[in-house]
Structure formats: C-alpha cells, structure tokens
C-alpha cells in the first residue's frame, strides 16, 4: 500500500506556476469565446437580412456593428488563449475550450431562447468533470530557452509529415468539396477550420514562447524563425475565421460548436503530441487519465448537441412537434442536423411517390 501511495505521489507532483497561469488564461479565454459565438451569430443574422449571407459568399457582415462586437470579444478570448499556450502545454489548454460550449449553451438559452434540456445540464457537468481531470493530470510545460529550439521541433520528420498531410487535406477540401458540398455538409467547413487550426495552435505556441522570452530579456525577434511562425499564424487564423463564419451562417450554432470543438481539439492534441512530445514526460497512468478526461468532455458535448432543443417531459412526437417550428424560425431555413431544408424539399420532389411535408404544431398535424 505504501509503495502504491508513493507511486501516485510521484505521478502527480502538482501544477507548476506556469501551468496555473496558463489555466487562468484558458478559463478567461473560454468565457470570451463562448460569448462571441452568440454575439456573432446575431450579427450574421442581421447582416443576412439586408445583404448576401456569409454562407453564400457574401461579406455584408463586415458592415454590421454587432458582428464586430462579437469579433472583438473573440479576439480578446483568442489573445488570452494565445497567452495561455505560452505558459502551459496544449494538452492542458485546448480541451478547456469545452467550457466555451457551456457558456455558449447558457447564453443561447437566454439570448437565442434555445431551451436547455436536463440532459444538456448533465452534458455541462460532464464537460466540467472532464476538464478538471485533464487539469489535474496535465504534463508540465517543457523548458524552452530559444525559438530555435521550437523550430528544431517543428522541422523534425514526424511533424513535417503531419503538417504536409494537414495542408494537403485542407486544400482538397477547399478546392474539391467546398463548392459542391459546403452548403449541405457541416463537416466540410469545420474540417477546413480544424485542420488549419491545429497548425495555427502550434505556431501560436511557438510565437507565444518567443514573446515570453523576449519580455524576459532574451530577444527572440532577431531570429527569422519568429517571423516565419508569425506569418503562419496570420495565414491560418484568416483561413479559420473565413470558414468558421461560413459554418456559423449556414448551420445552427448547436451543430457547429460541438463538432468544431471535437475536431479541433483532437487534431491539436495530436499535433502537440507529435511536435512537443508531451506524453514522453508522462507515464501510462497519466496518459490514460488524460484520455479519459477528454472522452468525458466529448460525452458532455455530445449530450449538449443531441438534447439542445428537447423539452423536459415530452414524448418523442411531442419533441418533434416542438422542434420543427423552432428550427424553421431560428435556423433561417436550415434543419438542426445541418442539412438545408430547401435541399430536403428538393429531394422530396424527385421522389417517384409524392410526399407531403408536415409541420406539427402542439395542437396537431397540419399538411402544407
């Protein structure tokens, strides 16, 4: 028993001061980013009512003040997130983004009038429990004293292979799939955001380390590698924002937020493990515990997504009756599952047997 207790003490040595700073910054980031999703969604709706929608290639949202409020809120959150990566490993910082989904769900309940089911509340609890598990078992930040050291990690064969695969997949999605399937399949836009996002996080961490070292008296701005990382960050962030705007404007927030989180976080953790070798400094128990925490967060986001528009105490037919009118009103013609209603109607007209679409209000079905 004593040896077992000693092994646990060796495995868990507490959080370092840098990890604590990164944790506080990551929590602040989740607060701002979660709020920005709702504010930007409202701005995109307003802009779409008076001009070409972002999902159709329009940029009228750039003239909408509310969208800019959401954008500034997101920028503040991203700055806090940027700083968090300079102090803590990506395995600690990135999964905490699930808290932004909780904040987004709470604000959607208040502002967008999207009811939160009891199982949605359970999903929030699971996200918090999973986040705490990861925080308690996250690896300590690697000691890095120069941006050249980060550059050496980024140019190792394993990470170069990963980066090439990500860039290739993103280009294929943009060129081949976005024009044909972007408006009907949510995974296309989010796939581009997530793939590019994993590279942006690695570059953000490298740039954050360079700035942290510069502010501490070791100037890293004299190295060209610092500016290469800066260029990569700008390119990736612009690409992310463009396709994230398209996803938010085309599909329901309840669909975009959890799927984007799952894909982005999974790819970022994979990139961090390859580049910074975070798991090389941990034993099997800690790694498995972190993975369990991550799976717990995924379970929470799944519950939040699946029960977003369910009403407590309603039967399945009752839920359908309450959900269909809401989707038609809140999603601007798009179904909750991410498929545009116009496409579904078009498919119905192609059917050899005529089909009638029913809208089910609470007092009974009515054919339209």
UniProtKB/Swiss-Prot annotation:
Q: Which residues lie on this side of the membrane: Cytoplasmic?
A: 40-66, 112-115, 179-189, 242-255, 305-368
Q: Where found, per UniProt?
A: Cell membrane; Early endosome
Question: Which keywords describe this protein according to UniProt?
Answer: Cell membrane, Endosome, Ion transport, Magnesium, Membrane, Transmembrane, Transmembrane helix, Transport
The main location class comes to membrane
Keyword Cell membrane annotated: yes
The source's domain of life comes to: Eukaryota
For this record, the Gene Ontology CC terms, alphabetical, are: early endosome; plasma membrane
Topology Extracellular: residue spans: 1-18, 88-90, 137-157, 211-220, 277-283
Supply the InterPro entries for this chain: Mg_trans_NIPA (IPR008521)
Q: How does it sit in the membrane?
A: Multi-pass membrane protein
One Pfam short name: Mg_trans_NIPA
A GO term (biological process) for this protein?
Answer: magnesium ion transport
Listed GO molecular functions? magnesium ion transmembrane transporter activity
Q: Which residues cross the membrane?
A: 19-39, 67-87, 91-111, 116-136, 158-178, 190-210, 221-241, 256-276, 284-304
NAD recorded as keyword: no
Q: Which purpose does this protein serve, as stated in its record?
A: Acts as a Mg(2+) transporter. Can also transport other divalent cations such as Fe(2+), Sr(2+), Ba(2+), Mn(2+) and Co(2+) but to a much less extent than Mg(2+).
Q: How does it assemble?
A: Homodimer.
Q: Which family does it belong to?
A: Belongs to the NIPA (TC 2.A.7) family.
What name does this protein carry?
Probable magnesium transporter NIPA3
């Amino acid at each position: 028993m004593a040896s077992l207790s000693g092994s646990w003490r060796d495995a868990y040595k507490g959080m370092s001061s840098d990890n604590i700073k990164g944790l506080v910054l990551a929590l602040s980031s989740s607060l701002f980013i979660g709020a920005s999703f709702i504010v930007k969604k409202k701005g995109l709706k307003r802009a779409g009512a008076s001009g070409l929608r972002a999902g159709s290639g329009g940029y009228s949202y750039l003239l909408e003040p509310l969208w800019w409020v959401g954008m500034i809120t997101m920028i503040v959150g991203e700055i806090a997130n940027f700083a968090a990566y300079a102090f803590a490993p990506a395995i600690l910082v990135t999964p905490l983004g699930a808290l932004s989904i909780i904040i987004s769900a709470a604000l959607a309940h208040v502002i967008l009038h999207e009811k939160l089911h009891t199982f949605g509340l359970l999903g929030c609890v699971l996200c918090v429990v999973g986040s705490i598990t990861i925080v308690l078992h996250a690896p300590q930040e690697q000691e890095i004293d120069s941006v050249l050291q980060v550059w050496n990690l980024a140019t190792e064969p394993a990470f170069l292979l990963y980066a090439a695969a990500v860039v290739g997949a993103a280009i294929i999605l943009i060129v081949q799939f976005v024009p044909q399937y972007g408006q009907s399949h949510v995974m296309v836009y989010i796939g581009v955001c997530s793939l590019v996002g994993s590279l942006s996080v690695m570059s953000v961490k490298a740039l954050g380390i360079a700035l942290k070292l510069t502010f501490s008296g070791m100037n890293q701005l004299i190295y060209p590698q610092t500016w290469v990382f800066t260029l990569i960050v700008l390119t990736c962030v612009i690409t992310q924002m463009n396709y994230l705007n398209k996803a938010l404007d085309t599909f329901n927030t309840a669909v975009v937020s959890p799927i984007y989180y799952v894909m982005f976080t999974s790819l970022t953790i994979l990139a961090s493990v390859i580049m910074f070798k975070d798991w090389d400094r941990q034993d099997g128990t800690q790694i498995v515990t972190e993975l369990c925490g991550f799976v717990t967060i995924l379970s929470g986001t799944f519950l939040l997504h699946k029960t977003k528009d369910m009403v407590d105490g309603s039967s399945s037919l009752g839920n359908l009756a309450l959900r269909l009118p809401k989707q038609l009103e809140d999603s601007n013609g798009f179904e909750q599952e991410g498929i545009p209603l116009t496409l579904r109607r078009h498919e119905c007209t192609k059917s050899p047997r005529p089909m009638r679409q029913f809208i089910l209000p609470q007092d009974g079905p009515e054919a339209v």
